[in-house]
């Protein structure tokens, strides 16, 4: 009887240790086969979300299409990524945004002006 108990203990110890090892491998290799976790969904590819945001925005002046900011004039629209973009006004009531690219302050506007003159 003591021998039977020790055999049962050894087998259960082997089972527990193998279960722990396979749990480690499941976790290490993406838990394939046991539990399925849901991936976050991508943003929809149609324009309905943007249109709903645009139509729901409250603005009594001009609503910037790129940032949904409410400003007095179209050329006052901010850049969408102000930390990495500079804005240059073209003088026709139009403003464009472009990458700062590591240039000095105002360098983007100078490059746009040179390109408009055909120098760059």
Curated annotation (Swiss-Prot):
Residues spanning the signal sequence:
1-20
**Per its UniProt record, what InterPro entries does this chain match?**
LCL2 (IPR034543)
**Which UniProt keyword terms apply here?**
Signal
Question: Cross-referenced CDD domains, in alphabetical order?
Answer: LCL2-like
Summarizing the function annotation, the protein's role is: Probable component of the endoplasmic reticulum-associated degradation (ERAD) pathway.
Q: Which family does it belong to?
A: Belongs to the LCL2 family.
The protein's name: Long chronological lifespan protein 2
Q: Say which species the protein is native to.
A: Phaeosphaeria nodorum (strain SN15 / ATCC MYA-4574 / FGSC 10173) (Glume blotch fungus)
Q: What is the lineage of its organism?
A: Eukaryota, Fungi, Dikarya, Ascomycota, Pezizomycotina
Its gene name is LCL2
